[in-house]
């Protein structure tokens, strides 16, 4: 099953949710009869999973995004192209939005509207405002 199909389904094994605290799990997931957990409909309705060409982000109808995950992709591009892609993604975020990128995929990149998240487990940035 493809990654986008899995994301749209919004169903996760208990193992996948081990790092999610009980309060969040109870608030945002419904236990299923097969032992998996499904994202609650009110949250699932707010999620957009789309296949995009990162080299054509200017054409993508993306703006005001709350969260963007871009992991295990940037390593395939030259440094200048990575920066271009990251700048476009940063511009697509809503104020307070979160950009999560793969650890080790970005070195020395900064954007004037983004602030690094202080967490050693992830490489992420929030948009000012």
PLM regions with names:
Residues 67, 108-129:
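Core SAM-dependent methyltransferase catalytic element
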């Amino acid at each position: 099953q493809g990654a986008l199909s899995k994301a749209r389904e919004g169903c996760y094994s208990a193992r996948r949710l081990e790092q999610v605290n009980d309060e969040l799990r109870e608030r945002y997931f419904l236990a299923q009869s097969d032992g998996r957990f499904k994202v609650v409909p009110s949250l699932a309705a707010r999620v957009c999973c789309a296949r995009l060409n990162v080299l054509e982000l200017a054409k993508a109808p993306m703006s005001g995004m709350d969260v963007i995950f871009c992991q295990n992709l940037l390593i395939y591009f030259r440094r200048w192209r990575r920066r271009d892609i990251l700048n476009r993604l940063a511009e697509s975020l809503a104020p307070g939005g979160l950009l999560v990128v793969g650890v080790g995929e970005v070195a020395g990149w900064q954007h004037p509207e983004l602030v690094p998240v202080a967490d050693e487990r992830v490489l992420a940035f929030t948009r000012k405002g």
